[in-house]
Amino acid sequence: ADGIACRTVETFEAFGLAQTLIDEAYWVNETTFWRPDAEHRGDIVRTGRVQDVEDGLSEFPHVIVNQARIHDYLLGFMARSRTRLAPDYGLEFDSLTVDREAEYPVTVTLRETEGGALRTVRARYVVGCDGARSGVRKSIGRTLSGDAAGHAWGVLDVLAVSDFPDWRFKSAIQSSEAGSILLIPREGGNLVRVYVDLGTVDDENRTRVRGLSREEITETANRVLHPYSIDVKETVWWSIYEVAQRLTDGFDDVAGRSAGDANA
């Protein structure tokens, strides 16, 4: 994710990366809240403005910086370390078995994405950070339960002109009928990320929602923002994703653990 909590910035300080990070990032100092106007329900009005990070929580700010940049920072730290550690690319998880009596109980089979050759790795532990369709989670016998229907969001990083007063603040906006928006300014002082509520997704409408264009998502955003608007000059990146209300029935085994989106 592109949002980095202040306590996570503290962790980056241990790697000597915090100052570089906060010099480049957008600082989320305040958050504003907008709701439907009580007298004109089709319009929105500001209803609140709060400090984003409570006093005394951290010496560092909550910041926004592109995930690829964080990746670059960490790769640079690894390259300068004593071991000159480097990640392996072009491998995908194939299978996992556990022999509880062995010194290295975990045996993981990896498949090369080019050519399909298999590699075997033996270890004491394995941590699966392989996303919502986690192969590690399945291999340690864990399953997901919860609501099969997800909630869809359109997300755009845009260069745009807007008369919305809080365009350069993190803003949570709820309209009476058109849905919701979360605005998060990006680093650099020009781009803004726009999260647009696209509603509940099920088997009947999933294809239609996933097929929405960026122009249609922008139209929805403008309906939410009324009486304000955005005029998008350039969209540098956009996507549609779903958030499901699910949770795994367990996070770990004797020698295996799932983490992050692999648990949801």
Predicted features along the sequence, with ranges:
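Core beta-strand elements of the Rossmann-like FAD/NAD(P) dinucleotide-binding domain
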Residues: 114-125, 129
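Flavin (primarily FAD) cofactor-binding/catalytic cores of flavoenzymes
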Residues: 91, 110-115
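Short, hydrophobic/aromatic-rich segments at coil-to-beta transitions
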Residues: 103-108, 166-168
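A conserved short coil-to-beta-strand element within the FAD-binding core of flavoproteins
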Residues: 89-106, 241
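Short strand-connecting beta-turns/loops that link adjacent beta-strands
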Residues: 38, 70, 101-103, 115, ...
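Conserved mid-domain beta->alpha element of the FAD-binding
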Residues: 74, 128, 235, 242-264
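Conserved FAD-binding catalytic core of PHBH/FMO-like flavoproteins
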Residues: 76, 125, 129-244
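Active-site-adjacent segment of FAD-dependent monooxygenases/related oxidoreductases
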Residues: 3-81, 88-90, 99, 175, ...
